[in-house]
Amino acid sequence: VIEGYGDGTYRGDQEITRYEMAQMVARAMAKSGVSGADKAMIDRLAAEFADELNNLGVRVAALEKKVDNVKWTGRVRYRYIHRSEDNMSDHEKENKNTNQVLFRLEPTARINENWVGKARIDYGQADNMNTGSNETSATVDRIYVEGTYGTTKIDLGKIPFKTQADYGMVSDYRMAGGQVVFGKDVKLSLAAGRINDDNYKVFATGGTNAGTTDYILKKTASYQGVEVYNDRAQKFTWGLGFQRVKQEAEMKALFDGTEVNIWNVGLGYKFSQDVSLTGAYAQATGINDGGILGKIDSKHKHSYAVQLNYKGAKASQMGSWGAFVGYRHLGELSTIHSTYREFGPMNGGEKGWEVGLSWAPMKNVVGKVQYYW
């Protein structure tokens, strides 16, 4: 039970202090499966060295308080994007080539047993290889507090926000506001806040009608959303939700309405540990014909996506890899800021096939290639 000094010796010919003896007793107290006789001896020793054990505990606690309670993670990312667009006016193709470099830091600060503070700090640079222009930005992309009480999670501040029911098809970006998620196996999500449209690129459109701007909303809009979905780790996943974005002045001018209401649903199935299939659908309501947009076709009011996944590269596992193939139709008015825009090449108002391949050539390094047509 008594381990001595850890080097195989007990140094019986040397005197030890009561604190050294208390350390040995503390190690003995932490052991399990000791006999009744040994347990009685340990209890007597603990009573004898109670003051030293107490003082030793105070010293350890004091050291723990001095340990930095902020943990840092981060990444460095390079992207090359080649985008070829048909110019319908002169029947020519326009090629755009962009280099993007991103340095990201993500600190997490422990506040107490229930709350932590989180942030995401981005420093990025983008070079347009066609025009020679260069853009550099440094932003605090997220800053918020997160509370956990049992199976309830609360996020408040400039938070990450993803529509889980449809695997991020409607939205996967950020919002200034709050979100509460209840439950474990089946979850209920309630979210509300404000969306900075100029940065968020809400309802991204390429201008489907004469007179439209590149992005429908330029001012801050209010957002409310509710979703019910099951745990994403289950074999069969499902979810449904309702999202509302409201901006009276601009929406009134664009389509003679004051808000866009989006109903979203998603289904997924894991055939095995390596193969899974997901699908999602969203429909926008509350939109009228009129205003700058004129008559709005149904294709702009609904979105759908389906994707087949095989494995997936993991940064912690060198040599791991994965692939996917999917088809998406993203209506401008039924996607707020889709995950296929945030992590892929697709904007609102576009549809097509996408394939991708990911690979981890070494630990903590992942490469990914995506092609869309």
Where are these regions (language model features)?
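Charged interaction patches that mediate protein-protein contacts
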Residues: 50-73, 226, 231, 235-243, ...
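Outer-membrane beta-barrel pore domains
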Residues: 9-15, 79-95, 129-135, 148, ...
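Outer membrane beta-barrel
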Residues: 15-18, 69, 75-78, 94-204, ...
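Short, low-complexity, polar/charged sequence segments that are solvent-exposed and flexible
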Residues: 93, 173-177, 208-209, 342-346
